[in-house]
Amino acid sequence: MFQDNPLLAQLKQQLHSQTPRAEGVVKATEKGFGFLEVDAQKSYFIPPPQMKKVMHGDRIIAVIHSEKERESAEPEELVEPFLTRFVGKVQGKNDRLAIVPDHPLLKDAIPCRAARGLNHEFKEGDWAVAEMRRHPLKGDRSFYAELTQYITFGDDHFVPWWVTLARHNLEKEAPDGVATEMLDEGLVREDLTALDFVTIDSASTEDMDDALFAKALPDDKLQLIVAIADPTAWIAEGSKLDKAAKIRAFTNYLPGFNIPMLPRELSDDLCSLRANEVRPVLACRMTLSADGTIEDNIEFFAATIESKAKLVYDQVSDWLENTGDWQPESEAIAEQVRLLAQICQRRGEWRHNHALVFKDRPDYRFILGEKGEVLDIVAEPRRIANRIVEEAMIAANICAARVLRDKLGFGIYNVHMGFDPANADALAALLKTHGLHVDAEEVLTLDGFCKLRRELDAQPTGFLDSRIRRFQSFAEISTEPGPHFGLGLEAYATWTSPIRKYGDMINHRLLKAVIKGETATRPQDEITVQMAERRRLNRMAERDVGDWLYARFLKDKAGTDTRFAAEIVDISRGGMRVRLVDNGAIAFIPAPFLHAVRDELVCSQENGTVQIKGETVYKVTDVIDVTIAEVRMETRSIIARPVA
């Protein structure tokens, strides 16, 4: 009687349309219940039985029920699942398998089976890549996944590397292929093999892509020739090797080893500017005036060179600082080092006065044993030899940016627009509360940005600098010339690392077209998208492996009285994030460790401060002493507490 009853259907429709609904993201808790977060202000409670239908991070539409003043959400429709492809640890044996996703808030095992054609017998503890196949909100009875790739066994010492690379879907090894002979590019190469070129790198570096030569000129001027390895002399555009490099976009540098963009025969041998080996290069000859200005007679040309010495950063720095027992092998090499130090001094002063100079942060290096165990983590401060290379490279990249802009009007440029215009007024208001007066319009210009940065650098602490960081836009890769506010430069295009950056290879090809007087094709914008995405993935992979190794390294310090100096890098409602000064590890200090009475504690991300009873006790950039309370290996997180 009620079947196909139009009135009943209408009533159902009416009820459905009158029921309140909300779209948001599921946030799980460790207690079984969860929340539907609609926006920063509004969230709804999801009871434990309803949480069985969803997963942390799912974007869903839910029906909102109100009972006795309390609202709760009942998941109804899946908008976007949180998990699609993921990595995890396998449980059980071949006939009954499940996988636990490797994610801090996903604790439940998901039933699964191996995909057809995957020839591996999975066992307890194996790491695998899986893809979700079923979801309760899609009408399935339960969650279900398919194992699509075996990563490695549970006790493999190199789990941090293999799992991280699989998670981000990145290559594990160097590309195949070999380039046996140089291309005929129709370039005339200047023979500079008699000049005393030197390379300065870490002792372990094999892929040397830059060599330097300096010469004193009359009128207190200096000449610098920057010679860069020439992989495009071996790799034709559109060839198999070129396509592989285009996909990788960068060499991926992880703690302990790298995965090169080019085959190792090229990156570490044929293209590497090894000492006493003749190599083809793309070179830039520039003249620096007494105050460090790059004069207009910039010249790009093809050449052959023979590096006369592979110098090492620390040894060169020691010698220039009159310490250590290393000596340059000849007076000619010593003279090169002295001239390069002079160039560094001039260019550093020029950038300080006319552009911007980054504050020096140390590099942290993991020292690993045979089995991937962390023997030590050392902070390597940026010393004079590092700055010599950095100043030479920045100068060379400024030259390329100018030449490509003026001769072609395009290239692969690093562009940074400073502050987002939408934030200019809020930025000016924030600075005003700290006694700095800036014009909201002026700060959006390159000069205005540089002026503000210099004022911030002159502040006694980095606190204000950290406050305005959220107003800054991100650096981008563009085919269009544009300013780089972060460096304080009108234009910046890198070409000095073509062995490890595909964008630099593109700029090499464009510079060669300029040298030959040929027309060149503008690079496709898609390539900049691929490069930006790869840069993001490589950085995430480096961070993930680092987190794993830091957790391994600090595990035996948990619960001990060992003190670490730590800089506060971020404050949130839940506590503070700190960076250990000696080794670079990031640790979290939960709010209850800061003060026992929650009502007397205010942790403000907005202000970058922690107040107890109305008094500011901690602020971002403060350095405090901490001990390690706990290291959670399954989430690779380090929990610290302040030393009382």
Curated annotation (Swiss-Prot):
Activity regulation remarks: Stimulated by the presence of a monovalent cation. Acetylation leads to decreased substrate binding and decreased catalytic activity.
Keyword set, alphabetical order: Acetylation, Cytoplasm, Exonuclease, Hydrolase, Nuclease, RNA-binding
Location in the cell: Cytoplasm
pH influence on activity: Optimum pH is 7.5-9.5.
Temperature dependence: Optimum temperature is 50 degrees Celsius.
Segments forming domain RNB: 189-516
Phenotypic consequence of gene deletion: In the presence of wild-type RNase PH (rph) 80-90% reduction in viability in stationary phase (96 hours of growth) at 31 and 42 degrees Celsius or when cells are rapidly starved at 42 degrees Celsius; if rph is also absent there is no visible phenotype under these 3 growth conditions. Its absence leads to extensive degradation of rRNA.
Superkingdom of source: Bacteria
SUPFAM superfamilies the record matches: Nucleic acid-binding proteins
Catalytic activity: Exonucleolytic cleavage in the 3'- to 5'-direction to yield nucleoside 5'-phosphates
GO molecular function, a single term: exoribonuclease II activity
Any one GO BP annotation for this protein: tRNA decay
PROSITE patterns to which the protein is assigned, alphabetical: RIBONUCLEASE_II (PS01175)
Keyword Nuclease: yes
EC number of this enzyme: 3.1.13.1
Record PTM: Acetylated at Lys-501 by PatZ. Deacetylated by CobB.
Misc: In K12 strains that are derived from W1485 (including MG1655 and W3110) the rph gene has a frameshift that leads to loss of its ribonuclease PH activity. In strain K12 / MG1655(Seq)* the wild-type Rph protein has been restored.
Name the UniProt record assigns to this protein: Exoribonuclease 2
Gene: rnb
